[in-house]
Amino acid sequence: MFPMVTEFMNYGQQTVRAARYIGQGFMITLSHANRLPVTIQYPYEKLITSERFRGRIHFEFDKCIACEVCVRVCPIDLPVVDWKLETDIRKKRLLNYSIDFGICIFCGNCVEYCPTNCLSMTEEYELSTYDRHELNYNQIALGRLPMSIIDDYTIRTILNLPERKT
C-alpha cells in the first residue's frame, strides 16, 4: 500500500482510541456526580468522632501516684511531673503535672500505660491558639472536661457519613 494511506489509517485508529479514553474518563466523572458531598462546613457542622479518637488528654489529679510511667513511655518525654517525697509515709506526693500540646504527637502511650488510669483521651480536637505558650496545659486545664459536641446546640452534628464505594 501507499505510505500515505497507512499513515492515515494509523491516525484514524489513534483518534478512535483517544475518543474511547475520553469517553471512559467522562463516564467515571458522571458516576461521581451522583454521590453525596464529602466535605462539611466546619465551624457550623462537626463530625462526631469515633470512640477511639485521640484528642486532648484529660488528667485526674487525685488518681495520679507520680510514678512517671507516662514520661518514660512518651516518645518525646513530654509530660512534666513534679513531685515531692513524703518521708513520713514514704510515698510521692504530686505537686504539678503539665503537658505541652504544641509538642504532643497524640500517640496515646501515656494513656495506655498509666497504671491508675488517671489519663484519658477526650474528643476535643480544637486546640488552635494565637500564642503557642497557651498550649502548655497544667493539671487544672487538663482536669477540665471538654464540652461534648453532641450537647452543643449551636453546632449541627453529622452522625452518618456517606460510605465510599470502592
From Swiss-Prot:
This is NAD(P)H-quinone oxidoreductase subunit I, chloroplastic. The lineage of its organism: Eukaryota, Viridiplantae, Streptophyta, Embryophyta, Tracheophyta. Keywords: 4Fe-4S, Chloroplast, Iron, Iron-sulfur, Membrane, Metal-binding, NAD, NADP, Plastid, Plastoquinone, Quinone, Repeat, Thylakoid, Translocase. Its cofactor is [4Fe-4S] cluster. Residues 55-84, 95-124 form the 4Fe-4S ferredoxin-type domain. It comes from the Eukaryota. [4Fe-4S] cluster 2 binds at residues 74, 104, 107, 110. It is a peripheral membrane protein.
